Regions:
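Structural and coupling elements of P-loop NTPases
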Residues: 1-531
Length: 531
């Protein structure tokens, strides 16, 4: 096997998804701790330590203790090269999370043991199901009082429609949490103090057959309960089948506490053994194989002003095939231009490392002078194919945006367009108006705060937001067949265009959508756009 193929085969690229506050960012931190990428894990809430989490780099994230942008983190562990796509956990950021899932080969789903399957978990799971990627479950916060373990598994199966297979089993919860039982090794693993999770800690392993030592370690009552549960589990749970896991039909489940490091490294090791190396990707010419094809990639995220001093803009690309070399020329398919990618770098939070090479599965950031859009394909100059586009999902909240100081119009237009190109917001214009009348659409209302904050802090522009009553927006799929001037809807319907010139319709409620379809026979409306 060539070094080139070996490099691709040792890549594991995955996203971490969860409902808000399930512990996703904390788990990410602990992965980095075990990988040696950081020496001290920062508490997201800032209670045990004043450190900020490495993956929460933007000022607004540090202030609020939530992730609002998707970070890309890479580290080495046990011979693997791991790329974590740390997605926003707040419920307002599902569209950015969706785009990030397009760049992942698998997903780690974090569930709070005291709450079970929550609303955001269902939504994100559905997105993973659409792509058919494997899902690995980490049931977190066993250091707090948890729901019954069998009930948690039953809830995952019923709510999400996926079979579960526990890889390990928790011993107690809350103050009685002793550790985990590893089903494969048939041993109980207990942990020493980890200084509130900021250090790795050391593990004690005892075979479950050694009842005397087991009772000494976890107590007689806990030992009896564990032995009973293991017997029940071995007879009742689904058999492990790796092919079912990789098809997204069976989720391996691990239990632990990211905050105190219980079960984290066990989960990481099992995940790396089961998850796939980069897989072939669908393009308009067919499947593109990671190892057999030369370099290709697609843009899944754009972030402006990552370095405030330099007013820069970075396009994040997922390499899908081949090897990237910093000196090579590549084709930007949508722009039909051959170019060298400027300042290729690996970015861990706000720290950067210039790259000379990267492989399929890796995420690289490149300087973007404003030519890239989300979903763009890059490949070798002799090739010309496009990866499937990333859908634009319908926003659910709308506001009219006005600048407070008309003398700063240039900064206002630049700022709002850059933030829109990153995919954080969508901007629309009413028919026959200019940029002075902008309607902003967001998936969640917190993005309005982010927009206001970023315009003030990065572009020195103050804005006023006027909330609008619209809750539904639809793209006109057959726009070439529709006379927009003659299109009639309800009195509350508004016609707008997106920044690409596509016509859309805004509605106050679902009834208005239905009435408009009834009044305009042949009209085809869509909840998302690929154009």
């Amino acid at each position: 096997m060539s070094n080139y193929t070996e490099e691709i085969n040792r890549r594991r690229t995955f996203a971490i998804i969860s409902h808000p506050d399930a512990g996703k960012t904390t788990l990410t931190e602990k992965f980095l701790l075990y990988g040696g990428a950081i020496n001290l894990a920062g508490s997201v809430k800032g209670k045990a330590t004043a450190r900020h989490a490495v993956s929460d780099w933007m000022e607004i994230e540090k202030e609020r203790g939530i992730s609002v942008t998707s970070s890309v983190l890479q580290f080495e562990y046990d011979g693997y090269c791991i790329n974590i796509l740390d997605t926003p956990g707040h419920q307002d950021f599902s569209e950015d999370t969706y785009r990030t899932l397009m760049a992942a080969d698998s997903a780690v789903m974090v569930i709070d043991a005291s709450k079970g399957v929550e609303a955001q978990t269902r939504k994100l799971f559905k997105v993973c199901g659409m792509r058919g990627i494997p899902i690995f479950t980490f049931i977190n916060k066993l250091d707090r009082d948890a729901n019954d373990t069998f009930d948690l598994l039953d809830e995952i199966e019923k709510e999400l429609g996926i079979a579960t297979c526990p890889v390990n089993w928790p011993i107690g919860s809350g103050k009685g949490f002793k550790g985990v039982y590893d089903r494969e090794k048939k041993c109980v693993i207990s942990y020493s103090d980890t200084e509130k999770g900021t250090k790795e800690g050391t593990a004690t392993e005892i075979p479950i057959q050694d009842e005397a030592r087991l009772r000494e370690l976890i107590g007689g009552e806990a030992a009896d309960k564990l032995l009973e549960e293991v017997e029940l589990l071995d007879g009742a749970s689904a058999e492990f089948d790796l092919s079912e896991v990789r098809a997204g039909k069976l989720t391996p489940v691990c239990f632990g506490s990211a905050l105190t490091n219980f079960g984290v490294e066990i989960f990481l090791k099992h995940f790396l053994n089961m998850a796939t190396a980069p897989l072939p990707r669908k393009a308009d010419t067919g499947l593109i194989d990671p190892a057999e094809n030369e370099f290709s990639a697609f843009v899944f995220k754009i972030q402006a002003n990552m370095n405030k001093a330099h007013r820069d803009r970075v396009a994040f690309m997922r390499i899908c095939s081949g090897k990237f070399d910093a000196q090579m020329e590549v084709r930007h398919v949508q722009g039909n231009k051959v170019m060298r990618l400027s300042q290729p770098q690996q970015i861990m939070a706000d720290e950067r490392k210039i790259l000379s090479e990267a492989y399929a599965g890796d995420i690289i950031g490149v300087f973007d002078p404003g030519i890239f859009s989300i979903g763009d394909t890059l490949c070798m100059p002799k090739d010309k194919f496009q990866y499937e586009g990333i859908p634009t999902f319908a926003p659910e909240h709308f506001a009219r945006v006005r600048q407070m100081d008309t003398m700063k119009r240039k900064q206002f237009v630049k700022g709002i367009q850059q933030i829109a190109q990153e995919g954080a917001i969508q901007i629309f214009q009413e028919f026959n108006t200019g940029m002075e009348e902008i309607i902003v659409g967001v998936v969640g209302v917190l993005q309005f705060d982010v927009l206001k904050y970023r315009l003030e802090n990065e572009y020195n522009v103050e804005i006023r937001l006027e909330n609008l009553p619209y809750e539904h927006i639809r793209w006109i799929e057959n726009k070439d067949e529709v006379d927009l001037e003659k299109l009639t809807g309800t009195s509350d319907m508004k016609k707008v265009r997106d920044m690409k010139g596509n016509p859309l319709l805004l509605f106050v409620n679902a009834w208005s959508v239905g009435m408009t379809l009834d009044r305009n026979k042949g009209l085809v409306l869509a909840e998302f756009s690929r154009s």
